[in-house]
């Protein structure tokens, strides 16, 4: 996940409603996304030059890769950052493969996959010309533990072996469990064996940085690039421009084509305005990409001239409602089960734009995750919900607060939840939170209310990236917490450990499918929907395809212009 904004998971705060979700398994992914793919524009392959424009409703959460973890920002990160590994570039399974990036290969495991060794490529540099060394890798990894900065992806803290009191490089110094015997060699020790570690390293929170840099919020305004582009200018909530990074060497990078000379984001646009501009395709909008279109626009893209530049498919994420099990009423499993039965998923789908843009959620894991089991544990049943509430001694009614993003689609979803729970005597008070701070608020247990509408996208197509981050109670943190239910069940924790020890990825994925059912017996969340994307690209956009590693959004590392001089 990545969070979808879903998380983006659900039309995210940022532009393409994208997020990191990929196919796992060490050197090659096995995930099965369902997005329709293809190339758009007047040429299947982008030419060199020109500026790609991106139209967005909201700014990215953070430019610092240990802070940001929502859908839109993960795709963006690959333009300016590189890691030891990354996802391949291409539609379908090609885009879910795990390939070497800064490292010469996807790593060598020892000690039953508890220790991993990597060798860095030659001629790799940061934007200021500083070589990317093993010390930079070690420093970048350790930043995930900083209590202020490390609020994004949980995988650094989940996987890397570190003392319990370690608080990152700025407060605690070096992380000794990452060895750097020379400038080119990195030896990483994990808490436990993890066969999918190369897949985890494809996530941006493992980005190397020069030692000592990035304290506080420094990288949120001026990050240090290692990819083909660097930040040229940035006005928060208004615009962002990337220009070429002259220190990037194309011969060291098999993934990023870097065809455009620049990328320019425009933030703060109304979704309906974006739709109108993308359909019209006038001026620089012919060179633009944007988020999934709104429900009201769907019928219009059936016109042949628009259909030719349209992509559609599942975004690979689950939109869900987390229920804080530490709260008075929600600590009772019967109440949580009642809420699951009470919510009418058809009204949720309608709120998200209808069946063209969403399908009903049943399991926690979305259809694109390997090993996922198709089942529906809580079909809509108002009478069953009332019965469970009566058994809990709450037939007289009570009230709950629901956190949601101040964004039209999520507001509509929240109202649908409110109306459904009203039918069983539960009054829901909706708490609208600004998109730019939403995940920080709901990820801070001290600030959480009763429930929150959010989303999660697998970081690669495995339950390992879906269920442990959301439901392992031993990893609840004071900031950047992804276990919104704050559930800490010993049987669930034990099963997570059992699956994590499996070295057969197929066996592990099947076990996660069964764990999904075990968790839903406790009803800590309500799976609401699986969102679909319909993307209309500018007529001059080339090389565009939906990526299964970025929630069905356009993979920015391959996109470019058919005619750069237009």
List the predicted regions and their residue ranges.
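Extracellular/periplasmic solute-recognition and catalytic clefts
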Residues: 151, 156, 232-243, 264-327
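N-terminal lobe/hinge region of extracytoplasmic solute-binding protein
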Residues: 55-111, 224
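Gly/Pro-rich hinge or "lid" segments in bacterial periplasmic/extracellular proteins
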Residues: 89-93, 193-257, 262
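Long beta-strand-rich cores associated with HINT superfamily self-processing modules
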Residues: 36-37, 535-566
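Structural transition elements
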Residues: 229, 341, 355-391, 408-412
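Alpha-helical secondary-structure segments
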Residues: 132-142, 183-190, 227-228, 257-262, ...
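Extracytoplasmic/peripheral linker and loop segments enriched in polar/acidic and small residues
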Residues: 178, 427-438, 468-538, 563-566
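Surface-exposed binding/hinge segments that line
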Residues: 119, 136-138, 146, 150-210, ...
